Amino acid sequence: HLYIDRIDLCVFGNTQPFRVRMVNRINDNFDYFYIKNADASRVYGLELEDLLSPNRISYLVHQNTLIEEHIAGIPGEKFMRLHMSDPNLNPIRLAKEFVKFNERCFVRLLGDMHSSNFVVDVTPDFEETHYRIRAIDFDQQCYEAKKSIYLPQYFKENNALIQLGMDVITPESMRQYQREERALIATRVKSSHTELEDILQTMESDQLAPQSHVDQLKTELAKHYQTKDFLKCSSMGEILRKSLSLVSR
């Protein structure tokens, strides 16, 4: 009772995936799926998203082909362009979610989270509106050399959310939200210890990025966290293991 209604070539980004529209013949309900190249960083990124974020995600891999489910939400660029002036917007909740999203990306080293690579999931409640910012592209997991690439706060495309945070939350509140998110990540690390250990061991033996990227990132993180332990790392997998260990202290 399922059939493929349409296949689109998505020309945005650097991967140009196919978007497949699957329709239920019985009730005309439909879902989208994306067909992409199954590069290592993207697969690791999907696994870490499922284990370490508050979001669940499903995908299939066969040889060099990856099939991802569609992640529902308003594209970040569109949300900032059309919804920031909504009178029903809850600025504090939205700013808080951006701080927490920023922290999630940095701790698990997911890079390139500008407004084209995430969506905003808006959930109205009986009193307030809740927001969840979700990554939709994972090909920059543990690849980039610069620390700033793993922090969404440094992308000019995200300036509307960055400015909102500066306007409505204090530095003290921001640090509180960061601590909250790191505590949640620590809980997820413990609850998925076996699966995460398998992934980290595989990543440590895999070459995810040029050695120059590894050397620059471990140096910048050693300075950021004020610990020389990062300097002992020889791969992106080892850097990620060290980053995750810091939230569990």
Label each residue range with its predicted role:
Residues 1-78:
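Conserved ATP-binding subdomain of kinase catalytic cores across diverse folds
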Residues 50-53, 64-69, 100-101, 163-172:
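Short C-terminal domain-edge/linker segments immediately following a structured domain
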Residues 59-62, 76-78, 102-111, 141, ...:
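Noncatalytic linker/hinge segments flanking ATPase motor cores
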Residues 61-64, 86-87, 95-98, 161-165:
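Short, surface-exposed, polar/charged, turn-prone segments marking secondary-structure boundaries
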Residues 78-85:
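AlphaC helix of the protein kinase catalytic domain
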Residues 127-249:
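C-terminal catalytic region of ATP-dependent kinase domains
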